[in-house]
Amino acid sequence: MIERGKYQSLTMVNWNGFFARTFDIDGLVTTLSGGNGAGKSTTMAAFITALIPDQSLLHFRNTTEAGSSQASRDKGLYGKLQPGACYAALDVVNSRNQRLLFAVKLQQVAGRDKKVDIKPFVIQGLPSHVKPTDVLIESVSATQARVRQINEVKESVAQYEGVQFKSFSSIVDYHAQMFEFGVIPKKLRNSSDRSKFYRLIEASLYGGISSAITRSLRDYLLPQNGGVKKAFQDMESALRENRMTLEAIKTTQADRDLFKHLITESTNYVAADYMRHANERHKKLEQSLSLRSELFSSRETLIEQNRLLNQVQQELEMLVESESALEQDYQGASDHLQLVQNALRQQEKIERYQEDLEELNERLEEQSMVVEEAQERVLMAEEQSTVAENEVDSLKTQLADYQQALDVQQTRALQYQQAVQALEKAKVLLSDSTLTAESAQALVAQLTQSEAEQTQALLALKHKLDMSSAAAQQFENALKLVHSIAGQVERAEASRHAKAAIQQARSAQQVVQNENQWRAQHRDLERSLNQQNQAQALVAEYQKAHQVTLDDEVMFEQERERHHAQLDSLEIALEENRELRSEQRRQEQDLQSDITQLQAIAPKWIAANDALEKLREQSGAELADSQSVMSQMQQVLEQEKQLSQAKDKLAERRSQLESEIERLASPGGSNDPRLKGLADTLGGVLLSEIYDDITIDDAPYFSAMYGPARHAIVVSDLSGIEEKLVELDDCPEDLYIIEGDVDAFDDSSIKAEELEGAVCVRLNDRQMRYSRFPVIPLFGRAAREQRLELLRSEREEVVEKHAKAAFDAQKMQRLFQAFNQFVAEHIQVAFAADPEQALVIARDKRNQLTRTLAELEAKELQMRSQIQNSKQALTMLDKLAPMMAVISDDTIGERFAELEEKIAQLADAKQFLGAHAKAVEQLESQLAVLDADPEQFDALEAQYQSADSQLQALKKQIFALSDLVERRHYFAYADSVDLLSKSSELSEQLKAKLVEAERARSRYRDELKQQQEQMNQYNQVLASLKSSYQAKLETVQEFKQELAEFGVSADEGALERAIRRRDELHERLHTSRSRKSEYERTLTSTELGMKELAKRLKKVQKEYVELRTFVVAAKAGWCSVLRLARENDVERRLHKRELAYLSAGELRSMSDKSLGALRLAVANNDDLRDALRLSEDNARPERKVLFYIAVYQHLRERIRQDIIHTDDPVEAIEEMEVELARLTEELTMRENRLAISSESVASIIKKTIQREQNRIRMLNQGLSNISFGQVKGVRLNVKVRESHEVLLNGLATQQEQHKDLFETARYTFSEAMAKLFQRVNPHIDMGQRSPQVLGEELLDYRNYLELSIEVNRGSDGWLQAESGALSTGEAIGTGQSILLMVVQSWEEESRRLRSKDIVPCRLLFLDEAARLDAKSISTLFELCDRLDMQLLIAAPENISPEKGTTYKLVRKVFKDHEHVHVVGLRGFGQEQKPKSEAQQMIEEFEA
């Protein structure tokens, strides 16, 4: 048994008097006891606010203003709250044992309206040990706490694993969550449902019989059965729509032939004119393009000739201007040549004298050298003579004294040894082991030179030191000279710059000396360079003309041979080109013949191809050849047969489903409609109606338990039934009758045992029945409705499949007919080659041939031009031949540039000498002054010491070497060592040496005399040469002065340049005159050609303008035609390719024939007739398209778009051909199936009424034993209104009488019911309601019932429950009973919407319970115990119930702070209910 959910506690945070209070809600009754103002109503207000957080409904008033509409502005909630965040939370444990905390956050909103901001939320899965205040309140200290904000509550909850926090933005979502978890009894979908729930809570709270509820008992107790009303409305709308659609189809069928005729003729009429205009426009465009091409080419030619004319005129003008300048230049060049020749003759004289001077100078220098050599020879002869004299004297002395000779030999031996020692010493000092006496003399010279340099440097430094103090002024003068030559320099760098200037002056003098040689070379190179430039100009001109560079003579010869070969090949190609042109013209004529033939074939092929493409699109097959067409045609036939069979099977299945749905929709779901009539005859009720409200889960069990008797009739008494049965004429073969109370049927008499998936029923001691649970139970309304839903879904699917199959079958039939027609008309042509493609190829070839012919003509002109160019090139090559030798010499330019640089240096040298010669000459004498800067004395002194030390070391080396050199003769005395041992031979050797020495002395004396005489002769010759040189030099100076007066450069180059310039100017003057004559001839011929071309251009332009004006005008109309056609999607209908091959006359004939047919077809339609009349204007082709659009628009309006879903009338008619047969049959069957009978309507309404009466009887059973004061029982009385009962009888039994209302198409079923209600109740005023509105009300069964509350009070018996006839306590008790009945009704009504394992909470309120006596309160306790309901009541202090939980509330005021003191008491007489296993486990866990 599923336990009912219970409210566990109510938590109030920050309410008036309640900062953080949790009230445990008792399982039965929770009593709030206290005096006035203790807070009882505030506590209930918090509970109700958490239950229904809708500020538009909440209105807490005391009992004194219960009936007042003018309550306080804040509706009793604003004043019950404290500032800041407030909470009201309901702790609930539902049937699934889930703990839920449904809470609302409240906060006062400042303002006059005293509104309260309410935000609902829920916390799910909070652990049992956590109190609601633990998450809503935060402890600040041991004595202080604060209220958390809602986001802080969310964060606080997040610390518990598995706990979910969810806030709600709408009350609907909050109540949906409450309903889902079983907190409220009914699903509150909208504000109306919330209002009903609040009115129920309010009526419970304030007690008594609520007029708001009693007046609307039908809305509270009777569920809305919208399915019946909706089913009737759907059937009505379907019937109405079917009838309208059927009428539209019939109308379309009647007009279809007219539409086809209208579309065909209008298409032929407009398309023929459309294509005729398109063809004409195409031809005109081709003509205009041809004229425009000719016009543009003529213009370009004229512009080119005009440009040529202007260019020739400009060049002629420039030529005339340059010719006069050339004449002047030529005369000047001739005069200049004469002057250069005079200067050259003068220069020749100077050169002859200079050659004499050079010769004299050379002789003078040679003679000076001869004199110097003679002097040297005289000196050498004198030295040799002196040495010989000394040797003779020495030998004579040695012979005179032998001992002296011996001493001399000893001395020489000693000298030899000293010489050897000197050699070793020199090797050590020089660190040279290879040193010898012979190399010592050369090394001495080197070191002596180095010594001289260092000595000179040392002396210079010494001189600088000596002069540094005394030569300051001299240094400044020398520095000024340096500044005048080299500019501003540093003092330290002055000496270096001075030396550099002196060196530069010397270099400049050398450069000036080479002037004549360089100028001669410059003249030769300039001549060669000019010749090379002239050749390069010719080469450049040749390259510009022929794009070939003549680099050398090999290339030159190759070009000459190439041009000769090209001339030969061009002559041959020119002949071949003529033959090729003839062949191309022949092919062009053949292609034109093929094009004409293809144009004749194309229309038939296009029609066949369109039909083939349509077949391919419809069938989805490739259809590559005729065999595939025949094969696909056979497949289509087979598919059509299969689809027809499938359609028939689906129609059969649909009929089965509809019959089953009709059976299940009948009262009781019986498969025999006679049972309902038998039940009425026997005065019973069908068993299926009694069990109509069982759940889906219980349906298999009860269906198996009753077995075949599930369609039995239940009667209150079996006596007399047999007699009635005998009198029956028509009844089922097996009829089961069961005796039992219809209002309280009990199945305890059936001995049934539930097995696994089955039921075993013992009929008697010897019989038993075993019935399995049906797979698809149909016992009970819920099971039948579930089955009906499945069957209806299947029926919809079957209907959809049947419609699709019928459509596909019709489509296949149409496709087979299309295949038949294609085979009969087009199959012979359709698979031939595409003539349009062949046409395109042929036209492309023809155009290609035309272009080829044009290219051949252009090629011929090009070849002639190339021949002319080759001839010109050969002429140019002949001119260039003599000059090719120098063109390949790349060094000329470099050498010329080098000489140019040298000549430039010459000019610089002359300029330098002219500017600084005197300064350099002065600087040479003062150069030593600059070596010692008086400002650098210390540096000079240190430099002097360093140089001195180096010089001393060098002197030591020189001394050693000089000693060695001085003693080198002693190495010849090596034999003296030997002579010392051979003294006898010494005398003889000395005598021999003396003789030899005397001969040498005589020879040297003779040579000295000769040399002296020769030197005197040389001196005389030198004096005469000096005298001749001085005379010649003076003459040359006079000649140079005369040459300078000429003012020209007198050299061979200047003469050649002058001659060359004169010749060039003469040649240019001759060329200019030739070109002038040529330009004048070109001007004349060009002007004549331009005149002829201008005449032709004017003619072509006139023709083009006229044709273009026509084309532009036609284009404007054609654009409007195209725009209209494209915007209205008719271009593909009008642009028929096959019409493009017809002539204009044929197209006009077709259009005229269709025009006649259209005049007859639209004679009765004013709009189309007017549009057709306007379209006959040939000057306005767009009007024909407008007529075609009007026809289409007319057809679109006539075709039902709700049946045929397409915008194209042609496609719509084609689709309608397929749909018409299927829809006609389908609509007829549907109309028969949807036909509504008045009897079935009455039966459905009666069945629904009876079901609700049975449900209310069951509700009354729960209230049968309730007593309050004198009231011993409470019940709900339900009965059918008399006027509506008369209506039901008229629907069920008087069908023939009211046939005029239900079998006419004038009224819908709702309107027919309204008319019948007026007919059977003429005394009732219907007011302003329309028949449709009244009929819809009559389809709602609740309008047939009247509900009232009756109480069994004392001796009065059952009477109407009214507050005036009952005491206060009795009224409160009666009201609570009624409310409990409503809650039960809501639970039953919502059972299907809620989960099966959820039983909702039941809780009601009662404020001011002191109005009930103790017995009444005890009755309430008993009612709560019996119906498992919780009750929250408020009572004064003098009421202390024995059961439940009682809270004593006392409001205390301490200074400015109010606090409600609460004491909770458990009822001392309360009996503990046995705890469930789950509760016991929970308590164990908590412990």
Swiss-Prot record:
Region (Flexible hinge): 667-784
Major subcellular site: cytoplasm
SUPFAM superfamilies per UniProt: P-loop containing nucleoside triphosphate hydrolases
Locations listed in the record: Cytoplasm, Nucleoid
A GO term, aspect molecular function: DNA binding
UniProt keyword list: ATP-binding, Cell cycle, Cell division, Chromosome partition, Coiled coil, Cytoplasm, DNA condensation, DNA-binding, Nucleotide-binding
Subunit and interaction comment: Homodimerization via its hinge domain. Binds to DNA via its C-terminal region. Interacts, and probably forms a ternary complex, with MukE and MukF via its C-terminal region. The complex formation is stimulated by calcium or magnesium. Interacts with tubulin-related protein FtsZ.
Protein name: Chromosome partition protein MukB
Taxonomic lineage of the native organism: Bacteria, Pseudomonadati, Pseudomonadota, Gammaproteobacteria, Vibrionales
Gene for this chain: mukB
